[in-house]
Each structure stands twice: as structure tokens, then as C-alpha cells.
Curated annotation (Swiss-Prot):
BP GO annotations: iron-sulfur cluster assembly; protein maturation
Keywords: 4Fe-4S, Iron, Iron-sulfur, Metal-binding
Protein known as: Fe/S biogenesis protein NfuA
Main function: Involved in iron-sulfur cluster biogenesis. Binds a 4Fe-4S cluster, can transfer this cluster to apoproteins, and thereby intervenes in the maturation of Fe/S proteins. Could also act as a scaffold/chaperone for damaged Fe/S proteins.
Gene that produces this protein: nfuA
Taxonomic classification: Bacteria, Pseudomonadati, Pseudomonadota, Gammaproteobacteria, Alteromonadales
Alphabetized Pfam families for the sequence: Fe-S_biosyn, NifU
Cofactor note: Binds 1 [4Fe-4S] cluster per subunit. The cluster is presumably bound at the interface of two monomers.
Subunit structure comment from the entry: Homodimer.
UniProt binding sites for [4Fe-4S] cluster: 149, 152
Organism: Shewanella amazonensis (strain ATCC BAA-1098 / SB2B)
């Protein structure tokens, strides 16, 4: 469920040494499954452990995860990153905003998952996003660009060389094309 690097585990052990005995850590997601989802790590004293918590054992401490957050922390990782400015813990949870779908989920659900988990985070750096409108019977994924992507002069390159290539590689034999249904209007919102 959650991977914690050796460096991060050693850091947690050091931090927990200054806490009352029996204190562990809690990894959680606030507003899981939404665009506003935020992940966090906090101390978890023994009296804060809930009956339905999932307890994960690590080297020198345990991590508690509440039942509601658990599916959104699949494939999450915690690391201690050190650079010239010092060190900091990083928590990456690719499924926090949208629950990972099973391999036997519908094509639409699997495409929507990839859009939310992988494509939209990339487009967000330019203030953009895409929305899946439909998947036609002949395997065409129809998408709509929003935010900074609407009216952007590079939208065709983003569509063909980025989004379409990624989706066709991920869904061979199921998708044949990705088509843009956006009525593009260049404006101050558009990424240049």
C-alpha cells in the first residue's frame, strides 16, 4: 500500500524518539477522491488509534491508515529528499484524487482514471485540463480541453504527440484515435 524509503524510515524513528512511548505515524488523505485531495503525515499517539485503522509495520515504528483513506493511498510513497537547502519528506500518492480502478473496469473508467491521475497533472502546469466526453463504438476517445489549454496555440501538438500517443499506448486494440471536441477560443486564459 505505502512504501517508505529507508532514509524516511530512519527520519521517522528519529522524530518519534522525542514523542511519548507508543506514538506512531498516521498517513491520511483529506477529501479523498476529489480534486481537492490532500495527503498528510502526523503523529499518532496510542489513544488516537481507531478500531478500523490499518496498521502497517515498518522498521522501528508503525504507520496507521484510516479505512477511508486506504484505497486512495495505493502505490503511495514517502521519501526523504536531501538537497543543498536541507532535507524534506515527500509524500507521493498518485491515487489520492481518484481511486485506482481495477483492470476489469470499463474502458471509460480506465481512461478517466489515466486522465485524472496522469494527464491532467501534467496539463495543470499550464493551467489546463481535459475531460473525457465519450468513447465511440469505433474506439474514438472524444475529449474536451479546458483552462489554459482552451485556445492554446500548441493544443494540436499536445493532443497528437502527447495525449493521443499516451492513451493509444495504454489501450492498444481498444482505442483507435483521440479527437478534440473543444470549441477553442483564444483569450487571456489560454497558455501561450
Amino acid at each position: 500500500m505505502i512504501t517508505i524509503s529507508e532514509a524516511a524510515q530512519a527520519h521517522f524513528v528519529k522524530l518519534l524518539a522525542d514523542q511519548p512511548e507508543g506514538t506512531n505515524i498516521r498517513v491520511f488523505v483529506i477529501s479523498p477522491g476529489t480534486a481537492q485531495a490532500e495527503c498528510g503525515v502526523s503523529y499518532c499517539p496510542p489513544d488516537a488509534v481507531e478500531d478500523d485503522d490499518i496498521e502497517l509495520e515498518f522498521n522501528g515504528f508503525n504507520a496507521m491508515v484510516d479505512e477511508k483513506s486506504a484505497p486512495f493511498l495505493e502505490d503511495a510513497s514517502i521519501d526523504l529528499v536531501t538537497d543543498q537547502l536541507g532535507s524534506q519528506l515527500t509524500l507521493k500518492a498518485p491515487n489520492a484524487k481518484m481511486r485506482k480502478v481495477s483492470a476489469d473496469a470499463s474502458l471509460v473508467e480506465r481512461i478517466e482514471y489515466v486522465i485524472q491521475a496522469e494527464i491532467n497533472p501534467q496539463l495543470a502546469s499550464h493551467g489546463g485540463n481535459i475531460l473525457l466526453v465519450e468513447v465511440t463504438d469505433d474506439g474514438v476517445a472524444v475529449i474536451q480541453f479546458g483552462g489554459g489549454c482552451n485556445g492554446c496555440s500548441m493544443v494540436d501538438v499536445t493532443l497528437k504527440d502527447g495525449i493521443e500517443k499516451q492513451l493509444l499506448d495504454m489501450f492498444p486494440g481498444e482505442l483507435t484515435e483521440v479527437r478534440d471536441a473543444t470549441e477553442h477560443q483564444h483569450g487571456s486564459h489560454s497558455y501561450q
